Amino acid sequence: MSPEHGRPINPAKVEWMNLGEEEISEAKLRVEVQLSNGTAVVEEFSLPLNYHQEDVDALKKKEKKDHTILVYTHVEIDTQLILGVCASLVPYPEHNSTPRVTGGTAMVKQSLGLPSSNYRLRPDTRAHVMHYPQQSIVGTRAMESTNFNTRPGGQNFVVAIMSQHGYNMQDAVIMNRASVERALGRSAFIRTYNAENKRFPGGQEERIEVPGTGLDEVKGLKSFDSYSHLERDGLPIPEEFLSTLDKSDNSVLVGKTSPPRFLEEAHGAFLQAQERRESSMLIRHGEEGWVDNVFVTESLDSGRLVRITMRTNKIPELGDKFASRHGQKGVIGRLVDEKDMPFTEDGVIPDLLINPHAIPSRMTVAHVLEMIGGKVGSMEARKIDGTAFTGEKEDSLRAGLLRNGFNHTGRESMTNGETGEEYTAEVFAGVIYYQRLHHLVSSKLHARSRGRVQILTRQPTEGRARQGGLRFGEMERDCLISHGASMVIKDRLLDESDGWEMMVCNTSGCGHIAYYDWKRRTTVCPNCGERSDVHKVQTSYAFKLLLDEMKSLGVAMRLELEDRR
């Protein structure tokens, strides 16, 4: 017991003794304190009540009107109110170290569940819906007050703490493939696309249609199969499967044509059919899914506005992230067939195997307590109260295990599913609430060989959405320098990035950048003119850009050339 100031738990039991009496001016309290050595100290003392007579009369009138009895004058703040909303959803947080509670509360926000009951009708930009969310067996009182149980964000997993062939080292987890096939942790990702008939000056406008079916000529038409899944109005058929991952070219989501980009393109527009551009909307690169809903409405300027939702099934796979409510996060390292998974004497096969090394150094005792509590709750068909400071105690949970024929330690004898031999050591197993987080490997997987570059720096674009290159940073460069792999450095940082042949004037030490004049078909130095001694130098375009930016500041950088030896 800690009697100091700032303690989270009130060590005293307070009893009001004279509340039923009339015209009380002071309250008599009986305070009982249980000391750590087991002895109880009892004291009685009085407190003056800061009530005016009118307040007491008002309370008495309320008593008569509501037929209630005034049983208290003061309310003590509950101990769990020192926690925030997310932290109060974590069971037994007082048994964890502070960083783990903080990490657990951060991941509660990332868990998948049911974001809204009308998600089929809401055109949100992105939505992620778990198929079968469950209420947690071990919960807290805050779950009722926050209505978390009406829209939960996870599922109850049968978990065993053991390693298997090293596939769950470094926080990875091993998952039962049969559980995944029975829709454990399965979710759907929904993305909304917006297409609009934009209007331009001069009466020109975009048209949502199947390109190439009208009277106008269309530049940049795709193959006929690319538009085969579109209806006559240019919109896709619901429940049509679209993909950018396979060879079939069916990534067109909305067929659309636009007027010529520049007026020069509209040559002969009055003499012949107008020429238009193909500007269909495609689904995002690297994604696939089914057309879920198509909403057609009007935009603010009375144009046609279309909103299409795409639905993608997200089945747990290698690399997907799962986490308990105690900051124990990890990605799937292996999916194991049901017949190869370990099983208990009762034939229970765990859904998840986590590594024993994840527990001791992190001191997440609440993770272990919740596994025991989930085991008792699932056997006795009741919920376990894991509210901070006042939840069901460990002794009660151990007694519940004994009542149901289990070892009070939570450990069980398990058999190797691959060899049929019983493990020499007992394995700790239980039921715990796990969350699937929205960090999915399918939405992060990215590779590139060749692709587009930026206009300014002529280096590869950045980011998965723009099909960008993978950054070769300073530390990677330093590794190659330490290896002495100079040709690899040149290949990565120059040839495969922004290599550039720069023309440099060497006429009497000029050192300025020259250029090639296509009209006169000769190299020209802006300082020396046509009759200049120009040489090609291989460098990066970023260096050439630096020289140009220095010129804009009024600083002329001159390059000195030497013969290569």
Question: What are these model-predicted stretches?
Answer:
Residues 1-565:
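Conduit-forming functional cores of very large proteins
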